[in-house]
Amino acid sequence: MADADSANPQFLEWVKEWLDLARERNSKGVTTYRTAYNSLKACPISFEHPAQLQQLKGFGPKLCERLEQQLKKHCEQNGLPMPPHPRSRKAAPVTSDENGEGSSKPAKKARKQKAYVPALRSGAFALVVGLSTLDEDTATGMTKAELIEVAQPYCDASFSAPSDPTKFYTAWNSMKTLLQKELVYERGRPLRRYALTDEGWEVAKRIKDTDHWQAEKDRTKDPTSAQPVIPNFQPGAISRQKSPSVEIAEPAQALSEYQNVVADGLTTSDDASLPNFTPILLPPGTFTVQLVLDVREVRAKTDRDYMQEELAKQGAKPIMRSMELGDAQWVAKCNDPNLLSSQGAEGDEVVLDWIVERKRLDDLIGSIKDGRFHEQKFRLQRSGVKKVIYIIEEIGMDPEVINRYAEAVRSAIASTQVVNGYFVKRTNKMDDTIRYLTRMTAMLKRTYESRSLHVIPTKVLTSQNYLPLLKHLRESISPDWYITYPAFSSLASKSESITLRDVFLKMLMTIKGVTGEKALEIQKCWKTPYDFVKAFEACGPGEQGLKRKRELVFSQTSHLVGRKKFTKPLSTKIAEVWGNT
């Protein structure tokens, strides 16, 4: 239907103008205006005043007020009377009978719809408050991890672990409600970002106008009165009254402190372009091996410190911080905090070749369903860490759910072991996981504290040369090379930024049968999607061209053996996707 044929062409024209303007500016209001435009265009009812539009989807008080101002301006310019506001119209007088008494009861006053304000310290409340810490004009938004970190102190429930181990739901599920009410919009794939819509900002302002807001601000500032699920650790050692053996050895580091430690650099073409350097040597006795645990590793909202307290009781006191990758790992912590800095490095920790990804069975099923499982393994591969351990915790779940996803879980575990070469450890409960981490810590102490560590200086590292350099050193000199924790975190944070190379690999891996190894071999022959498409176009038309397309990948990779080898049927399948065969 054309805009001119709409029941409200003038209102529709103005909303369309604002929608086009929002698109030009790449504004966050695009979603709101598009929803309002579509609902108004589809509505067959004619409205006199913009206030009446609030009954349509996408029209909030702010948009209706803007339309009202536009209508006033339009009426003044064209000498037209301004339609009366629906609320200002007087009710018709009640007719009386001969005795002067009303023949009917007065009409009931319409009940005004209450403006939405989420419940205090609920998931929706915390998410709105967290997003309102952004500047109202910003278009960047927050990632899920960034938003959870900001929102958690304002919520009683956990954003990472269900309050009941038998349930799937966390406080993050409130995001669905906010998206449905169009208070929040999301954008970006695969890394989604969230921001408040205009209506969302109105809700945030209403929250901050309530009597409870000042008390809530004071509560989150005072760590003794607030009980967030993820503690907001302050710099320095903090001892807990509940368990004197537990102390936070180091504060959580912000992403911005590590993000630019390692430069991006240029692409490394061959071994000759790799840097030469003198390694930093850490002799035995100059460091101790310590476990690092992610602060988000909690059992439930009532036992947020259970894991670190139990580890401390068993002699494996963890360093608590927000980790860029994995849920636990081990570092060599220098006895002299200035040892590394005196040799041109940063920090006082060196990352060892062990990292742990812990997953409860319900989280594993969820990550398989939404693709996070493969995304996490992809990032772990790019970390350069040789020994990756997947701990899978069994929990009480609905047998129907377990049976439904049993095959997917078995396939994921087998793939992790066989294709990725990672070790999978299955435990029955968190206590078993804690005992396993304790034993691993003791074993790694015995293994590493009696040997020297060769550390690659951060100044020679770039995000482009890190993996080729590590591979070259391990193959030609020694299998054991290490980097500092700040450098590792910087590289891990950069791995979230998807490059064209990463996108190409992921595109290839969507084809059934193309593993990560096979995708890498294709990329060695054709660096970009453009090169790959051009190679198929060069095969020419007709039957002969079709045959060449189907055999293109097979013929170019015929030297490969084992898991990297391409079969003719797989080559044909790739041609069907990329070569329009």
UniProtKB/Swiss-Prot annotation:
Superkingdom to which the source organism belongs: Eukaryota
Signal peptide: none
One Gene Ontology term from the biological process aspect of the record: double-strand break repair via break-induced replication
UniProt subcellular location: Nucleus
SMART domains: ERCC4
One cellular component (GO) term of this entry: Holliday junction resolvase complex
Record's function text: Interacts with EME1 to form a DNA structure-specific endonuclease with substrate preference for branched DNA structures with a 5'-end at the branch nick. Typical substrates include 3'-flap structures, D-loops, replication forks and nicked Holliday junctions. May be required in mitosis for the processing of stalled or collapsed replication fork intermediates. May be required in meiosis for the repair of meiosis-specific double strand breaks subsequent to single-end invasion (SEI).
Family: Belongs to the XPF family.
Summary of subunit composition and partner proteins: Interacts with EME1.
Protein name: Crossover junction endonuclease MUS81
Gene from which this protein is expressed: MUS81
